[in-house]
Amino acid sequence: MTDKNNPAILGTENVGKLLIQYSVPAIMAMVAASLYNIVDRIFIGNAVGPLAISGLAITFPLMNISAAFGSLVGAGGSTLVAIKMGQKDNWGANQILGNAIMLNLILGAIIMISGLLFLDPILYCFGATENTIKFARDYMQIILGGNIITHVYLGMNNIMRSSGYPRKAMYTTFIAVILNAVLDMIFIFKFGWGIRGAAIATIIAQTVALIWVSAHFTNKNSFIRFQKGIYTLKKRIVAGIFSIGMSPFILNICSCLVVILFNTALLTYGGDLAIGAFGITNSVVMFFVMIVLGLTQGM
């Protein structure tokens, strides 16, 4: 096995080389991931119309809340795994993997159930109107329905990256983004499913990506993998994950609050189309922000 795929280098390799080795694939993956929103908006805007774009923009704060809980577990779990691998503690890394999976399952289910139960009030709070609520609801019902898949896929991919496979984690994102774009074209234009088609495409793409990541952790040659006895939640591990992941969690929540304030002001002074325009601009800005986020993930 080559050194570049050997997590033992986390404790021996030059820091600069490690930063490049982990950051470049992470940057490419994060930039590719930002294309999710851009591709969806391109297809939805052309096939459905501007109000659908506004409805999609309304969903951003709710998706950001979900992402906040995902980063709480993902950032904390992947960091702890990297530490354990540097210490050559494979069993400890495996326990963190199992605990991270269980936390993502639990949090993903809570967000899915609570989001679906109170979806309309939440969307109205985030700036939806009678003109846009249908589009936002149609999209989020499907996205929330697949929320557990999203959480587990992203969490496991982060751990795969930090456990010595940054390129493989990058390929996972590429698979999801490319498949999402292809399915968008089929579901939106050929089948005429509109904004629901975009949501279905996203969940299917993430399901395929989850299968890809799961295959990695079932491989006996992987340094950490699915094993018996790793899925029991341990207070020490959960506390460690939450303490490290709290910073990105708070950042995501703050970002959510900012978008809600923007949506409220834009609805008051510009109307539904102004919210849609902000959503488009925000997607483009996030494309460049992801470069910095990719660098931090590589760290």
Predicted regions located by residue number:
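Hydrophobic residues within alpha-helical transmembrane segments
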Residues: 24, 28, 59-62, 69, ...
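Signature of the first transmembrane helix
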Residues: 17-78, 82, 243-267
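Helix-terminus/linker motif at the lipid-water interface of multi-pass membrane proteins
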Residues: 35-54, 123-130, 186-192, 256-283, ...
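Small-residue-rich hydrophobic transmembrane alpha-helices
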Residues: 53-113, 150-169, 277-299
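Short runs within selected transmembrane alpha-helices of multi-pass transporters and secretion channels
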Residues: 74, 143-161, 169-180, 198-213, ...
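Hydrophobic/aromatic residues within transmembrane alpha-helices of membrane transport systems
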Residues: 28, 40-44, 56, 81, ...
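Short alpha-helical transmembrane segments in multi-pass integral membrane proteins
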Residues: 1-23, 81-148, 190-245
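Generic alpha-helical transmembrane segments of integral inner-membrane proteins
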Residues: 27-31, 35, 39, 69, ...
